């Protein structure tokens, strides 16, 4: 076999990254290491016995198939435990986290296993103060959801459990969820209310697995009175996240604790959702929120203006409500733009004044790979041929990595397709480039702002070219 152990595992990781879901890869595969290759027997080390058992049970055949394909010969795969590798790798960040974490916080990046004064940190409700029942406008589109949320807030764990709120983007699901939390905390300040997005739940789970601190993770999520989980549709296809959430759900439900979930669709329309989870999500009440009608949209604008101290003529309210029909977020955004424009320009508030700046909302335009190449070349002063070529000069190499990162995040191209765009580079090279840019983005605020600026330029370019 004419391939080194490191190269074999690096190429295998690239294939597994493409085949498996991102949380699965991050939690189980990325933390493993190729330990040795002797007599066609590949030993893969894992950071804990838990991880070794899970890989052996669920991914042994997949990993074996991939490494054999990369090596070109039959291989036997074995799994071992080598926790010291992970401890050494994570030690610097763990030390920083232990000294800098504030009481009352639970960041996704902080080690779950660390304790403060002998116990896990208090969880902050993380609720938006504006999302209260008093600021929620009730209409025919959301009356049932509002009534159900009030019932749950008044008698958590007894009215509807779980309460599943579903509807499109910007229709008030998050507002109602957090209003439940505010209501309960006002009635009982000692209540343990926890609002979390599904992405945060998944990230915390991955972090716990990597640090072998699942017990702390479970205590954190299961020792609550009300659990509010937003965007639960993003649990689709995440097998281990679904497994863990299933047991979290059962523990809370059996203890009479309230669970409120929100998604952009009903449970049975979420693809690759375990049947048992779909059944549990549906066992309480599913309350759908529809787009608001014209009267409700006008009422929303009036209430928003009232809270913000704005004075709006009736015809302006009607114009905005007629122009923006799909969701509340766009509606309120249009109102803010109109008020800001009038304030800055000094013009009177009228339909004629705001009409030019409130064009009807349009679908976001597509960002193409060629646009990304153009913007990156201009930003870094390199030519297209060099960027797409194989030059190893530092400035060109960095610009190329940024272009790959932008393609991954702003187009639908797969890693292999991005590699093809850059002269047939292997998808592992693309993955490495994207991870390197992500790391620099986290560590360097100026670099993060540069990436944000590039993304904004791409959106402007896409809108101008696709008109």
Swiss-Prot record:
CDD domains named in the record: AAA (cd00009), Bac_DnaA_C (cd06571)
SUPFAM superfamilies the record matches: P-loop containing nucleoside triphosphate hydrolases, TrpR-like
Keyword check for ATP-binding: yes
Location of the protein in the cell: Cytoplasm
Disulfide bonds: none
The entry's keywords: ATP-binding, Cytoplasm, DNA replication, DNA-binding, Lipid-binding, Nucleotide-binding
Region annotation (Domain I, interacts with DnaA modulators) ranges: 1-85
GO biological processes: DNA replication initiation; regulation of DNA replication
Renumbered residue ranges of the record's region Domain III, AAA+ region: 126-342
Keyword ATP-binding assigned: yes
Physiological role: Plays an essential role in the initiation and regulation of chromosomal replication. ATP-DnaA binds to the origin of replication (oriC) to initiate formation of the DNA replication initiation complex once per cell cycle. Binds the DnaA box (a 9 base pair repeat at the origin) and separates the double-stranded (ds)DNA. Forms a right-handed helical filament on oriC DNA; dsDNA binds to the exterior of the filament while single-stranded (ss)DNA is stabiized in the filament's interior.
Protein name listed in UniProt: Chromosomal replication initiator protein DnaA
Organism: Synechococcus sp. (strain JA-3-3Ab)
Organism lineage: Bacteria, Bacillati, Cyanobacteriota, Cyanophyceae, Synechococcales
Name of the coding gene: dnaA
């Amino acid at each position: 076999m004419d391939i080194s152990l490191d190269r074999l595992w690096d190429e295998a990781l690239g294939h597994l990254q493409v085949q498996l879901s991102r949380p699965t890869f991050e939690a189980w595969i990325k933390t493993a290491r190729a330990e040795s290759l002797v007599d066609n027997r590949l030993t893969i080390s894992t950071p804990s016995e838990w991880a070794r058992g899970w890989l052996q049970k669920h991914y042994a055949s997949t990993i074996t198939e991939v490494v054999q394909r990369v090596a070109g010969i039959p291989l036997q795969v074995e799994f071992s435990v080598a926790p010291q590798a992970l401890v050494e790798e994570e030690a610097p960040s763990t030390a920083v986290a232990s000294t800098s974490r504030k009481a009352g916080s639970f960041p996704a990046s902080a080690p779950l296993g660390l304790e403060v004064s002998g116990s896990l940190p208090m969880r902050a409700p993380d609720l938006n103060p504006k999302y209260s029942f008093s600021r929620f406008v009730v209409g025919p589109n959301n009356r049932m959801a509002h009534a159900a949320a009030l019932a749950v807030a008044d008698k958590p764990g007894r009215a509807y459990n779980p309460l599943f709120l579903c509807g499109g983007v910007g229709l008030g699901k998050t507002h109602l969820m957090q209003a439940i939390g505010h209501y309960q905390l006002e009635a009982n300040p000692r209540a343990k209310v926890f609002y979390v997005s599904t992405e945060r739940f998944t990230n915390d789970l991955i972090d716990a697995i990597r640090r072998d601190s699942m017990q702390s993770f479970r205590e954190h999520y299961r020792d609550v009175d009300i659990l509010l989980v937003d965007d639960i549709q993003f649990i689709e296809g995440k097998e281990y996240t679904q497994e863990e959430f299933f047991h979290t759900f059962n523990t809370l439900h059996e203890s009479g604790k309230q669970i409120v979930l929100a998604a952009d669709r009903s449970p049975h329309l979420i693809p690759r959702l375990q049947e048992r989870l779909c059944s549990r999500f549906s066992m309480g009440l599913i309350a759908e929120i529809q787009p608001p009608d014209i009267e409700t949209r006008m009422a929303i604008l009036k209430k928003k203006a009232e809270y913000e101290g704005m004075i709006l003529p009736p015809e302006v309210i009607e114009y905005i409500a007629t122009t923006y029909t799909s969701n509340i977020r766009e509606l309120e955004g249009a109102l803010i733009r109109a008020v800001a424009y009038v304030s800055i320009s000094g013009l009177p508030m009228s339909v004629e004044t705001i009409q030019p700046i409130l064009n009807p909302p349009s679908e976001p335009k597509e960002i193409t790979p060629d646009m990304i190449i153009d913007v990156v070349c201009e930003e870094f002063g390199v030519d297209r041929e060099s960027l797409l070529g194989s030059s190893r000069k530092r400035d060109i190499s960095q610009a190329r990595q940024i272009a790959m990162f932008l393609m991954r995040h702003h187009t639908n191209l797969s890693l292999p397709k991005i590699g093809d765009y850059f002269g047939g580079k292997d998808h592992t090279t693309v993955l490495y480039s994207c991870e390197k840019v992500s790391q620099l983005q986290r560590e360097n605020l100026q670099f993060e702002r540069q990436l944000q600026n590039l993304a904004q330029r791409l959106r402007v370019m896409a809108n101008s070219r696709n008109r």
